[in-house]
């Protein structure tokens, strides 16, 4: 009997070279693991450094803003004091005594005499009376002032005098 030759099945086995040993696979893994750990550690150190720089920068920004706020508060306080002083100055300048003194000394105005004061009703039927002072027609209303300044005062006084003259004559005739 003749037998057919058998086919041998061959499964190739990994060839182990003399350079690699079974342990070297583990050491490569350890090296890769250690390299990863070093990279991770370096990344964490860099991240900590960046976070530290960021915190320093933000702290400096907060300090700068704080100094600006303090400066603005001081400026506000100064401006409020100046405002109060200016309000006191305005009140002093508006005082009736000062206005009367300036009117008589600098502007040359005089107090009206009793016979120069006439009471005229403000509006018909209102019942209120307005005090109006006039001057004699021969004298100007304002003396001692510059001609350009007194022109409108003189014109006003003359117009008032002409307007009140009929009422004055009617009051004298009654």
UniProtKB/Swiss-Prot annotation:
It is a single-pass type II membrane protein. Disulfide bonds: none annotated. Keywords: Cell cycle, Cell division, Cell membrane, Membrane, Transmembrane, Transmembrane helix. Residues 1-38 are cytoplasmic. Its main location: membrane. The chain crosses the membrane at residues 39-59. HAMAP family: FtsL. Essential cell division protein. This is Cell division protein FtsL. It comes from Moorella thermoacetica (strain ATCC 39073 / JCM 9320). The gene is ftsL.
